[in-house]
Amino acid sequence: HGDFLAERIDNKLVGGVSMLSGYINKVRAEEENVIYCIAGDMFRGSVIDAEYKGVSTIEIMNLLGPDVVTIGNHEVDYGLSHLLFIEKCANFPIINANFHIRTNNKRLFQPFYIAHIDGMKILFIGIITEDVLAQTKMDKVIGSFVDICEAAEEIGRICNTYNPIDIDFTIILTHIGFEEDKKLAAMLDPDWGVDVIIGGHSHTFLEQPVKVNDILIVQAGTGTDQIGRFDIMVDTDLNAVDTYTWSTVPIDETHCPRDEGLENFIMHYKDLTDKKYGRL
């Protein structure tokens, strides 16, 4: 949501992409097998984003370096054709399994991403529903599957196709809201092997994962004031979660070093927009 810049709260700098990047880089340096995911809504919320219709955001995200991202409803705010252009500007996979062209049912995005981590194959599938993408309901050419039931069926088709190639762990990246995540988890066949749902849209701040149908559901609010950290040990014999810890880590100057290169890059955009819109 364009939460690029830190704010001073209680005499402490909080949030902002440069400290978020500093924390992610710190974890990547300290730990092995780190994956950084975004569950949609990179766009909007900032004049820096709006002035450049998301191009500035994608350039900032390229420096932030997520491993995999799914789309949210605000990704289509500048139009679907522009989103397809933006997707080509990204240096990271943007996945969605159920956004398609109505006339021939071809997908608009890569539906999944397989991460190879320490000998494991981790399958990520991106999901959004038409209830979230209200602005596409009248579109005669482009749309999503109508409801969460069809989203569940699409997950099943992908899992059944790729599980035979020895997928070790499956994560669904959604942008449908926490209540819908719970409904979705309840619909998934255990034989499909879904382990985790990482959700967005409802901005739900979960202190602990919620388990539905033996699937762990997590969400970490919104913005850059915090990040969800999910440390998972996988039983590779069962291809399932063995143990885990979940926490929401504050992004502030007491926890996070600043990524100065990214800060300078953002300030370049801020200076340009300030000159255009700033008051004398």
Question: What function would you assign to each model-found segment?
Answer:
Residues 1-265:
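Acidic, metal/ion-coordinating pockets
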Residues 262-280:
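Active-site nucleophile-His-acid catalytic modules used for acyl/amide transfer and hydrolysis
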